[in-house]
Amino acid sequence: MKNYIQKYICKSVALFVGTSLMLTGCSESFLDPDPQTMFEPETVFSTENGIKSVLAICDRQLKRNYVSEDSREMIALPTEYTFSDLMVPSATDKSGLLDNVDNLLRPNSDQTNEKNLGRTNSIYFFWRQNFEGVRNANTILSFIGNVPMDETLKNEYIGRAYFHRAYRYYSLVFQFGHVPLLTKLPEVPKQNYRSTHRDAILKKMVADMEFAVQWVPEQKDMDYVGMVNKGACRMLLSKLYMSIGEFGKAKEQLDILIDKSGYSLMKESFGTFFEGGESVSWPITRNVIWDLHRPENKLIAANKEVIMGMPNRGAAKESFIPMLTMRIMYPFFFDNRIKMPDGKQALFNYTRKDGKYRKEYDYMRGLGRGISTFRTTTFYQDDLWAVNDKMDQTDLRHSAETGNWMHMEKLKCNNPDSEFFGQNIKLYAEDDYYNEKNELVTRKGDLMCSDTIRRWYDVPHYIFCLNDVINQAKETNNGLEGATDGSI
C-alpha cells in the first residue's frame, strides 16, 4: 500500500511541475485582450443609420409595452386595467391576487422574469420597460448633435426621441409618482439616483412635446406606418397639458387634432369583415365597432380614426409578438366548475375530430380557450353602460345581439351526455332537479358555477378577439388563444 501511495504522489508532483513549466513558458502578451470587434457608441451613433437603429428599438419597445411579456399567463395591458375600474386579477389558483397593495405596488416587488407563472401583475415590467425606453431616447438625444444631416431632419429625430421619452415618463409618473428624471446618458456608473417631483417632470415633458409638435411630420407625409407622427405628438401634448392643469391649451391641441388633421370618426362598416373564429356558434352581425377593432383594418387608409398604429403581424422573425388575449382575459369555462342541473359538466372544448363535436356549440373557436388571469369588473360589465340608470341598448360597444359583447347566459350546454344539451347555461338553477332514482340532485336557486371569479363574467369580445391563424388550421387543436405566430 505504501509503495502504491508513493507511486501516485510522484506522478502528481511530476504533473504539477510540468504544468508550471508550460505556463511560465508563455509570454505575458498571451494574456492581453484581443477583441475582434469593439462597441464604441461614438462611432456607432455617428451616422443617420445608427440613429435610425435606436429609433427602431424605441418603436418596437412602444409596441411591446402593452402587447406581450413573452408569457402565456400574463400580458402587460391588463395590469393597467386592474388599476382602473375595468378589471381585477382573477387567477384563483395563484398564491396571491395583488391583495396586499402596500407590499405589491412597488417597482421592485417582483423582479422575476416574465415566464414566472406565479406573477400576478406587470408592475416591475413597466418600471424596467419605461426606463429602457428613456435610456434609448436619451441615446438619440446624446449623439445626434454630431451626426451630419439637414437641420429639419435632425429636428424630426429629436422630436421623435422627445415623444418616446415623454411617453415613458407620462406612464412612470402616474404609475409610480415621483421618479428619477434622466435627460442624458450617465458617463460613469451611478447608483445614487434621487426622485424628481412629478409636476416638474411633466412640465419638462410639455416643453419637449411643444418642440416635437412643430417638427415631427404628419402621417400622410411619412413613408412608414408605426413611427411617431405629428398626430401622436399632439395627442400626447394634450394629455400632458391636462396633467398640469392647462385645460385651455389641451383643448386647443385637441381641436386641431379633431378638426384640422384629417382624422374623423368612422360611422359605417369598412375594410375587411372577419366573421369570427366560428360564425355558427358565435355569429357576428357586421357593424362599424367590430370592423374598427379588427387588426386587418387598423392601419388601412380607409380608417380615419387611427392616429398612430403599431404594426404587429406576420411571423416572429418579422418582429411579431404574440398576444394571447383570448387565453388570458376570457373565462375559464371549459371545466367541471360550471354544471347543468343534472350535475353534468356544461361546456367542453371538443376538437373537430371528436365524435361529440357540434359546430353550433363550438365556443372554443368562437370565443377562444380562456384561463382568466384577469377578468372584467361588475362596473365594466353593467354600470358603465347605463344612461340615467337604464341600460343603453343602442351602444354597439355593449351589444350582445351583434356578437360584440359576450354574456355567459348566451352560451349553451355542448355536452351531449347532459339532459340539458343545447340549453342555455344559467348561474342559478331555475327548478329542483331529480335523477331517475328520484334523488334530489339540484335545488332551485343552487349556484351552477363553483368559481364565479374566474369562470363567470362578460367579455368585450370585439376588443379582445384575435384570429389564431396557426391553431385554427389544426383540426385536432383544442386551445385557440389569440394572436399567435403567423397572425395578422
Regions from the language model: what does each represent?
Residues 2-13:
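Bacterial N-terminal signal peptides that target proteins for export
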